[in-house]
Amino acid sequence: SGLFVLADGMGGHPEGEVAAQIALQTISALFQRQAKPQLENVQEFLSSALLAAHHQILRYATEKGMLDTPRTTLVAAVVQAGAASWIHCGDSRLYMVRGGELLTRTRDHSYLELRNAPPPGLDRINRNVLFTCLGSPTKPIYDSTGPVHLEQGDRILLCSDGLWGTLSDEDIATQLSQQTVSNAVPDLVEAALRKAGESSDNVTVVALEWETPDTFDSTQGVSTDSISDDVFASTIQAGPLDGLVDDLDDAAIERSIAEINEAIRRSAARKA
């Protein structure tokens, strides 16, 4: 199995970069523990890992006594048994390109992207605003896809809104398909930064190209089947695992949400 994750901390709330790092560490820790060397159920892993990351962000906010919670978007993909599955929450995207054409991409959790009429009172508010993310005081909404069978040369790209907010889907698909992934990624990032200029947002990109087993003999990498629970086979900087994935059921998540809401209520009462 292979895990690819991208999280983009949200502005307008405290410590978005911390929320993103917590999400990356939590999902990476869970993957290491459960992929031995493959996951038993990829979709179940993705949904439970996303909720676990959400819970850990809420726990962090509670322990710090924060009145507003750190928040982040998330997109994660697992490649296993010749197929890809993915999950996302917010507006970090996954693109899949096959034969030079855009096969599919995720849909942002914004009113504009989903083409939903905004609720009453939202007419003057930017419809690009997200209605869900990890770390908010409400349980996150997410979409999952897969498994999608992979073919020779398929390319998958995960990115923050700093890329797609500047470059069109067509531009992204074209550049990703016309050169090697190792060249396409820095070129895409540079193009987005150059086009956005001083108004550029954070541009983060992760990409891969699928090679069928009969055309690719892997000589690198580490299998999770042969490492202990306190060692990471990951490029993600990881913190301690102890206690990281305890109490990650729905009841624990609801308790954390209730604690955050109660803190907000008490703060509002004091100000009144």
Question: What do these predicted ranges mean?
Answer:
Residues 1-272:
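PP2C/PPM-type serine/threonine phosphatase catalytic domain
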